[in-house]
Structures are given as structure tokens and as C-alpha cells.
Amino acid sequence: MPVPSHVSVATLQSVLQTVCSTGEPAIIAPSSFLGELDTVVDEVKRHGMKLASIPHGGITILPPVPISGTELFDFCAEYCKAQTHEERLAVRHKINNHNFLMQDPLLRMPCRQLYNPADYVLRIVHLCSELVSASEEEYHGAYGVAPLLHINPVQDVCGKLRSMFQSGSLYVKPWILEEEEERREMDESNRGVLFNSDSFGNGRGGSSISSSERSVDENDVADEDLTGEEVVDNATDTVVEYLSEKDFDVVTESGIFYDDSGERVHAIYLRGGIKKELCQRAAIAIEEAATTKNLRKAVNGGKTNPETGIVGYYDYLNNPTQRKCRETEFTRKNWSSVVDSCEPFLVALNKLYSECAPTHYKLQRIAIPHHYQLFNTVFSTMTVNRNFRTAVHTDRGDFRSGLAALCVIDGVFEGCHLAIKKLGKAFRLETGDVLFFDTSLEHGNTEVHNFDYCWKRVSVVCYLRNGLMSQICEMERRRWLQKQMLKQRLLDRSRQSVINLNATDPNLPPIYLPGRLLEVLSPVQQAALGFVVDRLSKGNGCVIALTMGLGKTLLSLALCYSHMYDQNPRDVLILAPKIVLTHWTGEKQKWEKYGLVFSHFVVSDGTDSVSFEIALKRYKQQLNGELPRTSHVFVINPEYIRTVLKKLTGFRPSLIIVDEGHRVSSKGSKLKDWLEGLRCTARVILSGTPVQNNAEELYRLIGWINSDVHSVLPPRVFTDLAGTINRYINGDDSALAAAVSAQRYIQEWMCSYVFSVMKTDLPPLNDYIIICGFSSIQRKMLEDHFGMEGIDGLTSIKASEHRPYHLSTHPLCFLGFISGVYKSLNGNHKLTPEAEEELESQEYASQLYSLTEDDIGLIDECLSLVNSGFLTEFVGLSGKMTVLISILHSIREKKEKAIIFSQYVGSQDFISRTLTSFDIVSSTIRGRDCHERRRRTIEKFREDEKITCLLLSTQIGAYGLDFTAANHVILWDSWWNPQVESQAIARAYRRNQTRAVIVYRLASEFEDTIVLKTQIRKLALFRCIMNEEASRAVPPEELLDCVDTEEDEGRRFLWRSLKKSYLEGGAPAVSKVFRHGDTVRSESWS
């Protein structure tokens, strides 16, 4: 069944339903949708189906194999052994009567299963019997056309039978295999360290994931490679030039080479750095890894594939393989010889690295996961090149805070120097010479002098692959450890106790959690927890950048529990904005029933609190030795931290967690200075939006968790990279290539410091920008109060200017704001900085303005309209109010709920009063509300079906709250920082949301469109840095109105009706509707 080249989510689901229902394979041609390949693979794997990389240029989706590998081998061997037709019929009869355990499909099936799984198995058995005695040519011919030969366990079974046939031992009884399997599992269990395979059992570091994992699940085999070959370092660039020796200064003496500023190391050259005998021993073992089976023709002049290969570990993130992060095929098959010959070489190279570049080495040692270390070095991977004169290129995917190590290990040749264009130097390398260098710089080999004669040059580049530290690899690793725990029945025994998640690998730092908590921790949270604990165990910190709604608070509480699970008392300091302190308290109480209990959990928002003062007094007594010492968790408002530290002299937390940690990135932040005084290096930053206004924020965040990064990537260099990206975002198309290069570098650089998950497995999000019109009265007020004859007269607006937002709400709201009517709504409570700014602006406006007779007449007219029941005419004075009422009527008809965010007290109050007039039941959360009142309001909103919407402040309600009872989000006004609005949307669009979420961004033709331009530029920057995309802001004139292309019939009707609704003065209530996703244009650069 062929499928179009571009596959939407709906189409893909339909294809999977067809395959699952009928048992018929489906073929997809991926040539034009390579960016969607990971999505296809993930969906197919999630439903237990299989992928094969044929036909050429395509992928075949097959139904799950309904039988284990052992059972399949038994049937195939018995069928092949049969000598008569009757014996084969007996085997077929046995298969037909077999009890196949079919998985319940996760898909919603249109009908019952329409095929017999026995027929599927018989097809496999017959295929293997036909090929068991075939020649190699016949077998390879079949491999090119038979998808079943590309999947496991079929591939393994056929290969095993062919090997047995060729050796004359075809009739080995199946029970022998089972006995061997049981004995191997028992041996591993007795060793106590299931994680180490035979090849790594000597404690030299770096365990073999795939070899041991195959014993756990035969259907999850690391050898399965759906491309038919291991796609390593796929060079897709255009063919580039070769370098000539005459254009460079040839370096023959050891030395260190810096950039022009003298701050940044580009290369370190060492003559005779490694003994020749060590090099030559290594060459004997790994030279054969260099083959022409690769995709690097572009860096070999574009003519043929060079002789090159990979030894060690690799991240096959772009391959449709079941295992992404694992050893290469050569490593698996030749490990014993690699161990004997390469270990001394790599250990010597590792020592040399630590001595010559200690800062780079330290950062690389912190970054590399233990299970990917080759012989306990800082190298995960070796690229072996034989007679390979590389053209100019940069190496992608290397650890950017470290250096790669190039060494010639064997050969007879002249020339072929390694030249670095930016340095203008070519380094002469003979056997034993070493060059540590920055592989992000353009480099290549000069000509070979004796090319016409017999020459040989074998070199190896040793480095750390960034992808091995990715969240994909971390999640794979976590799944593997969990399987090992299930195998040892540790999870079953721990449901009522505390368990160490890393118990099966003693080389990993322990992660202690209540057994019951594992039931609710998502795979992403467990992977992030493993990442954090690994970094903390090495005396370093990290940034946890999970998109909103993925559970950063629960993750942090679990981290605190594990960190404090020690006989020695430890203290944790959590800094959280005042508006989310109640959320922390609520989460702590919520998870107590799962065993997440803390003896002392002290929360303070900075206000006078008797309970807080009592807690501080007792803690001081513990520090002074008057009471027994116990562990404490302090959750403090950052604005109050200075006062707390003054009261707690001698307070030394062993872990600092900063929630909404982007605040630490502010220039000249006093908070950073105060935290530095605590002398705690274990620092964790939580942020769904680590990049908000500029790329330098991310640089400062990472610099705070590890200041060493500044020495390997100076601020000036990072600023230049960020500036290149900004040029492209702001419309300079000529900067695209440079921007992509800068993005890639920053992405690779941040990988080892930031655990980032920006995508979620949630229902669809439909996000719209609705351009609302102005009534003639609003336009006149615009002219009278802002001195403009038209809306197009303003091209900029100050962030402190609040009057336009109240005008776009409604003329009556505007008059109330500038005359001070809403002042009384603020009460006497302490205001947030935003509310204080609004109040100051309001007071300033009221000092300059008194209501005129026309204003008073308008107020009387508005009140008359309301009192007379002419509500449509009343809201018709404002485009936004007209749109809001129509949207809420539509939501109420569907018996759904909405949350409405606005920055301004005046707008919130006006909306609330208007909704009451329309009999639309709503609730409101104010900044001054106490925790208990806020909790009751939220609970009532969730449970009371009569309540249609909840009104709250963008600044207060955008953090920490869970409103998944609502699936509509209305953003009443726009704010300069788009991540504040992203936080607001995440109150509804988060874990536990089961329905599609619709976002309505109500934008006036005046102030909102100006703010949106700034928002979109910042959003493009965020996508550039946090996602592998070249993103830029789309000019407003290029945006397309989506009313007529809207797929949802209900929304299409709503948009059209709003366009046909007219305001006072005759302007339409809505002029255009855009999809928010269309405002940023992105291209994948991976």
C-alpha cells in the first residue's frame, strides 16, 4: 500500500490503523519529508510495529511480529529440517494452532483485526526456509526486495540458520538455545553488575549497552539498522575545495595557538606526544574500521567515498533505528582486539590532554556519561581515517567546550598536513604526533607529496559526541536501567520502600526515591533526574529547560528527596518567585501520599510570618548545637533572600535550585552576588524559557552554573555568534548560512549543560492572532489623547505606556483609568512591580487629565445602554469586547471552559462586570488574594459546570497553576516578552490535558500589533537557540488570513461571523485572523 511522500499526523494514524487491521505492509517515500522521519519512527515504535528501509528511497511499515525470537527460531528450524511434505504440513498445523499473544493496539481501530497472525508467521517461516541454503548473491538480492529481512527477530533468525547450514550444524535442537540463554542471564545476575558485558567486565570503563540489552528484549535489538548501513557523519554539504600547503605556514615545533585576541585556544600541537609503539599497536586493531561504507563523499572531493570509520560509541539520532545511542558495528564485532591494543593508546592520549588543556579536559570529564567512556577516558568516539585527504570542512556534533585529539598512528607518506584556515597554519603530523584542536573551525588536509607512489597514512581523531548527552540518549539509558531493575525484581520489592534508580550500575551516582513515586514520574522526568544527579555528582550544575507543563516542580522535589537521603544532614535552598510559592507548597502536599515527605519544608514569601520565624529560630539552634541537626528545605522568595541570609549566618546549602531561573541571567543581578557568597557549586536552574529577550541570557545562565565555560568560549565570541543569528532573524537573508553555522555551534555548545525538552506529547494546540477593529469613538479618543489622526501614525510604544491597552478594552475602561476610578480596586496590599507601575502611570495620567463634558456624556450614554438592555450596542464600542462575547458564547454552547489573561486590573474588572451583564458566569483571581481564597476559586472553577471562564492577571496567573479544566485560553492584551504568554498558555496546555487547546490572542490594530512585532522577533530567537531550526520573523504583509482555510467548521463559522459583525461607526469587529505559528518561518538545519 503506497503512501504519499508528505505524511500528516492524521494520514499517518490512518496508515497505522490499516497495517494493524489488515496485516498488509505500507510503503512510505521519505524523500520530501526527512524532517518528519523521527515522528514516523516514534509513532511506529510506540505502536509496536516494525520499520524496514526498503524499497530504495522508501520505508516499509509492517505489523508487529506476534511471536518471540526463540519461538520463531524453533518453527523455522523445524520447518527447514523437515524432509517430506507431510513433515512441513505438520509444522504449518502446529503454527496454525499456536496461541499468539497479540498486543492490544493503542490505536482506535475502525474494525476488528482482519488477518490471522499465523499467516504472518507462516510467511516468515517460508521466507527463511527459501533462503537458508541460498548463495550470498541470491541472499543479497532477496535482501534488497524483502522488507521482512530488515526487521528483527526475522533478520537474526535467518542469519543464524544460514550460519548453521554453512557449518553443517543446522539441526541444533531449540532447547539448547533456551538453556544457553538461561545460563547467560544467570551468570550476569551472579556477577551483580548486569550492566557490564563481557567486553567491559574488567572495570576499564564504558559499558556495552547493546550486547547486554539484547538479553532483556529480543525484539529491541541494537543491531537493527533500518537504513541498511550505519549512517555516520553524513556530509550533505556541497563539495568544497582542497587546501594547498603553499597557502599556509607549516608548523613543525610544539606549541599552543590562540585566536587573534589571545583568549581562546584553537590548537595545541605536540611532536612525539604518543610513543610510536602504542600508535602502531592501535593501528593494527582499528585500521580495518576504515572502509568506504560511509556517506562522506563530499569531504573527499565528491568523487568516491573515503576510507573512514567509527570506533566506540555513536549517536544515530538521524537514523530510523530502534537504538539511537550505542556502539558501532565494528566495535561490537571486534571489541576484544580493541581492548588489548587501543586502551594503552587512549589512556596515554587522555593523560596528555589533561596536562596540555586542563580546563577543556575538566569540562569534558564533567560532561561525558560514564557508560560512554572508552577506558575511563574523556573520549567516547574515534574516527579512523586511512589515506583520506579531507577537503575543507567542520566537524558536527563534537563537544564544543573541549578539543578533539588528532594523532597519526601509522603510515609512510609525505605532506598531507592538517591545515586550519582561520589560523593560517598547517601542522605536520607524523606517527605519534598529536594535535588537539577546535573542530568547529574550517580545516582539511594539504596535498600528499608522494601521491603517485605507494603511500599509507592512518590517523585517528578522538572526541566526545554531543548527541550521547542528549535527552534521547538519556531516556534510552533510563529505560534500559529500568528493564534491568524489573529483571532483578527490584521494582516489585520496592513499592512500599525507597529504591535507588541506579542500583543496577554501581558506577552511577545513586538516585533514591520512594517506590510509589515511580508510578507517576514520566520518562522525561526520570531522564532529567538522571542528567541532574550525574552533573551534581561531578561538582557541577545544569539547566533544566523543560517546556511548560512537563512537571519541573515534581522533578525538583524528587531531586531534593534523593539529595537529602543521607545520614548526614543536608540543606537545600530553593528560590522561587512569590507568585509560585503557593504552588510549591501545594505540590509538596500533593506528593506526600506517594512517599515524598520532608521533615522540614520551610516556605516564606518575605512577609512577616510567625511560623517562619519559629522555623528559623529552631534551625539556628541546630546550627549552634542546641538541638539535633536535621535536613531542611528552604523555599524563599528571591526578593527576601538577603534578609534571610542575614538572619542565618553560617547557612551553607549543599544544593541551590532556582525556579524561573532566567532571572539569574539579568545583567548586574544582585541575586547572583548574594548566592555566590554561599559557596555552593551544586546549582540547578529551572526554566521553560531560558532564552527570553536575547541569546546572551543563556550564556549568563550557563556561566553561573560553571564559570569555566567563559575561558573556553569568551563572551566576545558568543556575542558575535548571537549577533549573526539576530541579523538573520531581523530580515537579513544574506546572513542565513552564517546564522545556521552559529546556531549549530550554540546548540552543540549548550548540549552538555542544558537538559532540554521543548516538544510535548499533548493534544493539538490551535493558536490564533485575531486583529480586532476600533470603533469610531475609540478612533476619536486616539486622536484626542494621543495626537494621531489614524492608527498607522504610531510605529513604537513605550513599555510603561498603559493607556492604549485600556482604550482598546473599551472607551469607558479608558476613561476610568485616566480619571483614577480603578485606583480603589488596588486596595492597600503590597503591589507587584507591574501593578505599581500601572498605578503610577494611572496617577500620572489622572494628574494631567480631568473628565470633560463630552467624556461625562459618553459615560452616561454607556450606562444608559447597559441599563436599557442594549448590551450589543454597548460592547459594539470596542472590537475586543465584541469578539470576546462571541467567543465565550461559542465556548458556553459546547459546555467548555476558558481562562482569560490580562495585565491590567482595570481591564480585568471591566471584563468581569460586562460578562455579568451577559449572564456569563465567571470567577476572578486577584494578586492580593490569599492562598486559601485562590485555592477555593480554582477548585470551584474546575468543579462548577456553570462557570464558563476564569479571569486572572497575566503576570500572576502565568506561573505554576494548573487549569487543565479549561481548553480555551484568551490573551486579552499583548506583552513584550512572548515567554510570559507562553507560560500563561501552559496553564491549560500541559500534562493531563486531554482535549485540543485553542488560544485566542486578541490584538488591536494599535498597540498590540506593535508589541507583537517585538514578540515575534524574540520568539524566532528562542526557536533558533532551543530548537534545531533557522527561524525568522515573517513580515506582517506576508501573513495570510486563515479564515477561509480554517479546517475546523465551528471556528471557520465564528471567524466569518466576526468579520461580518460591525462596530459603532461601521468598522468590522475583526479584520484578519492569523495562525500564530505562521508568524515565524523555520527551516530545519539538521
From Swiss-Prot:
Residues 1-518 are annotated as: Thymine dioxygenase. It comes from Trypanosoma cruzi (strain CL Brener). This is Bifunctional helicase and thymine dioxygenase JBP2. InterPro entries: 2OGFeDO_JBP1/TET_oxygenase_dom, Helicase_ATP-bd, Helicase_C-like, P-loop_NTPase, SNF2-like_sf, SNF2/RAD54-like_C, SNF2_N, SNF2_RAD54_helicase_repair. It catalyses: ATP + H2O = ADP + phosphate + H(+); thymine + 2-oxoglutarate + O2 = 5-hydroxymethyluracil + succinate + CO2. GO terms for biological process: base J metabolic process; double-strand break repair via homologous recombination; reciprocal meiotic recombination. It comes from the Eukaryota. Gene3D superfamilies: 3.60.130.30, P-loop containing nucleotide triphosphate hydrolases, Tandem AAA-ATPase domain. Keywords: ATP-binding, Dioxygenase, DNA-binding, Helicase, Hydrolase, Iron, Metal-binding, Nucleotide-binding, Nucleus, Oxidoreductase. Residues 187-220 are annotated as: Disordered. Its EC number is 3.6.4.12, 1.14.11.6. Fe cation binds at residues 393, 395, 443. Dioxygenase that catalyzes the first step of DNA base J (beta-d-glucosyl-HOMedU) biosynthesis by converting thymine to 5-hydroxymethyluracil (HOMedU). DNA base J is a hypermodified thymidine residue found in the genome of kinetoplastid parasites, which is localized primarily to repetitive DNA, namely the telomeres, and is implicated in the regulation of antigenic variation. Probably also acts as a DNA helicase. Recognizes and binds specific regions of the genome, hydrolyzes ATP and allows the DNA base J de novo synthesis. It is found in: Nucleus. Residues 519-1084 are annotated as: DNA Helicase. Residues 883-1041 form the Helicase C-terminal domain.
